[in-house]
Amino acid sequence: KMAVILQQVVGNQYGDRYYPSMSGVARSLNYYPIGDEKAEEGTVNLALGLGKYIVDGGMTLRFSPAHPSKVLQTSELDIALKETQTRFYALDLKNAGDNFSIDDGFNLLKLHVKEAEKDGSLRYIASTYDPYDQVIRDGLYPGGRKVITFANILQHDVFPLARILRWVLRYGQQEMRRPVEIEFAVTLNHDRDKTGTFYLLQVRPIVDSKDMLDEDLTTIPDEDVLLRSNNSLGHGIMNEIHDIVYVKTDHYSASNNQNIAWEIEKINQQFLNEG
C-alpha cells in the first residue's frame, strides 16, 4: 500500500507569484557546533521563499536557535556579501492550471532577491549594504544592495522565531525519543507590524547511518584513547581507515607547511603503492 499526502503550500501572494516570508530546516542535533554552540542546542538553515531552495543546496543562513544573535555569515562585511542568499523560489501562479509535470519544479520561479524587494516582502528580513560607509545596516533603506540577514528576526526579535524553534525541537525530540529534523515556514503580516504565523510542515527523526557514532566518548578511559582533540568537527565511524599519518605538534611551525605537505605526500604515495 502507498499513501499520497497533499500538503498545502504556505505563503503570501504577490501578483502572479506566491511564497512564504521564510522557510527553514531545523535539527535538534548540531554535529558541527561553532564557538559557544553546543551539539544538543541544534542548528537551523533559513531562507527567503519556498523551502525547495534549501533542499536544492542554495545559500541559506545558518544559526543556532540558542544563539540567534551570533551568525557567522554576517559577522564580517566580506563574508555577508559573499555568503548570503541572492536567489529564491516562488510558486508561479500563471502556471497553476492543468499543465502538470513529473518535474516538481515545473511551476516554480527562481528569482533574484531584487524581485522580492519589488514585492515588498523583505521588511524585517533584509539589511542594506552602505557602500560609502562600508557597513551593513539592519533594515531597508533607499539605495544599496539588500542582504538577506534576517537581522530583525534573529537579533531584534521582531518575530520570536528562535524561541519557537527551541520549543518545537525540544518537544519533538522528547516525543520521538530521538533527535529530530523539522521543516517549517513563516508568513509575516504586512498589514500589522511585528506579527506573523509559524507553520510546522514536517517532523521526522534524524536517520542514523553507519557513519554516525552514538556513544558517550567521555566514558572511554584515557589509556584506551589513541588520539584526543578538544577542537574537532563532528564524529563518526569509518571502517576503511587502515593507516594514520600523524604530524607531531611539539615542534610544529606554520612556516614549514610546504615542506610538511611534501613529506606527507611522499608517505601517502608509499601507502598507495603498497596497496
Please place each PLM-identified region on the residue numbering.
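Conserved mixed alpha/beta core segments that line enzyme active sites in large multi-domain catalysts
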Residues: K1-G275
